[in-house]
Protein backbone atom coordinates (compact mmCIF):
# COMPACT_ATOMS: atom_id res chain seq x y z
CA UNK A 1 0.00 0.00 0.00
CA UNK A 2 2.77 2.41 0.94
CA UNK A 3 4.83 1.60 -2.16
CA UNK A 4 1.79 2.23 -4.39
CA UNK A 5 1.15 5.52 -2.60
CA UNK A 6 4.83 6.44 -2.90
CA UNK A 7 4.84 5.73 -6.64
CA UNK A 8 1.60 7.61 -7.34
CA UNK A 9 2.57 10.56 -5.14
CA UNK A 10 5.94 10.79 -6.92
CA UNK A 11 4.14 10.90 -10.28
CA UNK A 12 1.68 13.44 -8.89
CA UNK A 13 4.41 15.79 -7.63
CA UNK A 14 6.21 15.52 -10.97
CA UNK A 15 2.98 16.35 -12.83
CA UNK A 16 2.41 19.41 -10.62
CA UNK A 17 6.00 20.57 -11.16
CA UNK A 18 5.66 20.17 -14.94
CA UNK A 19 2.32 22.00 -15.09
CA UNK A 20 3.55 24.91 -12.97
CA UNK A 21 7.03 25.19 -14.51
CA UNK A 22 6.22 27.95 -16.99
CA UNK A 23 3.89 29.86 -14.70
CA UNK A 24 5.22 33.02 -13.02
CA UNK A 25 2.32 33.84 -10.71
CA UNK A 26 2.04 31.99 -7.41
CA UNK A 27 -1.73 32.50 -7.54
CA UNK A 28 -1.86 30.72 -10.91
CA UNK A 29 0.49 27.99 -9.70
CA UNK A 30 -1.76 27.35 -6.72
CA UNK A 31 -4.79 27.08 -9.00
CA UNK A 32 -2.91 24.55 -11.12
CA UNK A 33 -2.04 22.55 -7.99
CA UNK A 34 -5.65 22.48 -6.75
CA UNK A 35 -7.12 21.68 -10.15
CA UNK A 36 -4.55 18.96 -10.86
CA UNK A 37 -5.08 17.40 -7.43
CA UNK A 38 -8.83 17.22 -8.05
CA UNK A 39 -8.44 16.11 -11.67
CA UNK A 40 -6.02 13.27 -10.99
CA UNK A 41 -8.08 11.83 -8.15
CA UNK A 42 -11.38 12.23 -10.02
CA UNK A 43 -9.87 10.23 -12.89
CA UNK A 44 -8.64 7.40 -10.65
CA UNK A 45 -11.36 6.26 -8.28
CA UNK A 46 -9.36 3.42 -6.67
CA UNK A 47 -6.47 5.82 -5.95
CA UNK A 48 -8.88 8.36 -4.47
CA UNK A 49 -10.33 5.73 -2.15
CA UNK A 50 -6.89 4.52 -1.09
CA UNK A 51 -5.52 8.00 -0.44
CA UNK A 52 -8.60 9.31 1.33
CA UNK A 53 -9.68 6.27 3.33
CA UNK A 54 -7.20 3.40 3.43
CA UNK A 55 -4.17 5.50 4.32
CA UNK A 56 -5.91 7.06 7.34
CA UNK A 57 -4.24 4.76 9.80
CA UNK A 58 -3.48 5.21 13.46
CA UNK A 59 -0.44 2.92 13.24
CA UNK A 60 2.53 5.16 14.07
CA UNK A 61 4.99 3.42 11.72
CA UNK A 62 2.56 3.69 8.83
CA UNK A 63 1.84 7.36 9.61
CA UNK A 64 5.57 8.15 9.55
CA UNK A 65 5.96 6.45 6.16
CA UNK A 66 2.97 8.33 4.75
CA UNK A 67 4.33 11.63 6.06
CA UNK A 68 7.68 10.92 4.42
CA UNK A 69 5.96 10.31 1.07
CA UNK A 70 3.97 13.56 1.41
CA UNK A 71 7.08 15.70 1.95
CA UNK A 72 7.62 16.33 -1.77
CA UNK A 73 4.05 17.53 -2.23
CA UNK A 74 4.22 19.77 0.82
CA UNK A 75 7.52 21.19 -0.46
CA UNK A 76 5.80 22.20 -3.72
CA UNK A 77 3.18 24.05 -1.67
CA UNK A 78 5.89 25.79 0.35
CA UNK A 79 7.64 26.91 -2.84
CA UNK A 80 4.40 28.35 -4.24
CA UNK A 81 3.68 30.19 -0.99
CA UNK A 82 7.22 31.57 -0.73
CA UNK A 83 7.03 32.76 -4.34
CA UNK A 84 3.71 34.45 -3.60
CA UNK A 85 5.20 36.27 -0.62
CA UNK A 86 8.29 37.38 -2.57
CA UNK A 87 6.18 38.62 -5.50
CA UNK A 88 3.76 40.47 -3.23
CA UNK A 89 0.81 38.28 -4.18
CA UNK A 90 0.38 37.00 -0.63
CA UNK A 91 0.69 38.94 2.61
CA UNK A 92 4.29 39.57 3.63
CA UNK A 93 3.90 38.08 7.10
CA UNK A 94 2.12 34.92 5.91
CA UNK A 95 3.04 31.92 8.07
CA UNK A 96 4.07 29.45 5.36
CA UNK A 97 3.75 26.39 7.58
CA UNK A 98 0.22 27.24 8.68
CA UNK A 99 -0.79 28.28 5.14
CA UNK A 100 0.53 24.97 3.79
CA UNK A 101 -1.45 23.05 6.42
CA UNK A 102 -4.55 25.04 5.47
CA UNK A 103 -4.10 24.34 1.74
CA UNK A 104 -3.38 20.65 2.20
CA UNK A 105 -6.17 20.22 4.74
CA UNK A 106 -8.72 22.01 2.57
CA UNK A 107 -7.90 20.12 -0.62
CA UNK A 108 -7.77 16.84 1.30
CA UNK A 109 -11.13 17.44 3.01
CA UNK A 110 -12.85 18.39 -0.26
CA UNK A 111 -11.64 15.14 -1.86
CA UNK A 112 -12.62 13.09 1.20
CA UNK A 113 -16.16 14.51 1.10
CA UNK A 114 -16.35 13.77 -2.62
CA UNK A 115 -15.26 10.15 -2.04
CA UNK A 116 -17.67 9.72 0.88
CA UNK A 117 -20.58 11.17 -1.14
CA UNK A 118 -19.99 8.49 -3.79
CA UNK A 119 -18.84 11.09 -6.35
CA UNK A 120 -22.22 12.78 -6.56
CA UNK A 121 -20.76 15.99 -7.96
CA UNK A 122 -17.98 17.23 -10.24
CA UNK A 123 -14.86 17.49 -8.09
CA UNK A 124 -12.84 19.43 -10.67
CA UNK A 125 -15.63 22.04 -10.94
CA UNK A 126 -14.86 23.00 -7.33
CA UNK A 127 -11.28 24.04 -8.21
CA UNK A 128 -12.08 27.71 -8.80
CA UNK A 129 -14.10 28.08 -5.59
CA UNK A 130 -11.54 26.29 -3.43
CA UNK A 131 -8.70 28.26 -5.02
CA UNK A 132 -10.52 31.55 -4.39
CA UNK A 133 -10.94 30.75 -0.71
CA UNK A 134 -7.30 29.70 -0.36
CA UNK A 135 -5.78 32.76 -2.02
CA UNK A 136 -8.05 35.08 -0.03
CA UNK A 137 -6.84 33.40 3.16
CA UNK A 138 -3.24 33.96 2.02
CA UNK A 139 -3.92 37.69 1.71
CA UNK A 140 -4.39 37.96 -2.05
CA UNK A 141 -6.34 41.01 -3.13
CA UNK A 142 -7.21 41.71 -6.75
What is each of the regions a protein language model found here?
Residues 11, 15-19, 106-113:
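Solvent-exposed, amphipathic alpha-helical segments
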Residues 32, 36-43, 75, 79-87, ...:
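C-terminal peripheral helix-coil segments that are non-catalytic and often amphipathic
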Residues 1-17, 31-35, 74:
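An amphipathic alpha-helix adjacent to DNA-recognition modules
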Residues 14-46, 99-103, 127:
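Hydrophobic alpha-helical connector segments
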Residues 19, 51-55, 114, 118:
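Secondary-structure edge/capping motif, primarily at the C-terminal ends of alpha-helices
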Residues 1, 48, 74-77, 100, ...:
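A general structural signal for well-ordered alpha-helical segments in protein cores
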Residues 39-78:
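Short secondary-structure transition hinges
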Amino acid sequence: LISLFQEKMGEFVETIRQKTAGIESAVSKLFMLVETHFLLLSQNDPLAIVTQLELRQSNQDLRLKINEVLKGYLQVMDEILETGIKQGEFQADLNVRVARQMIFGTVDEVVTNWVMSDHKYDLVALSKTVHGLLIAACGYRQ
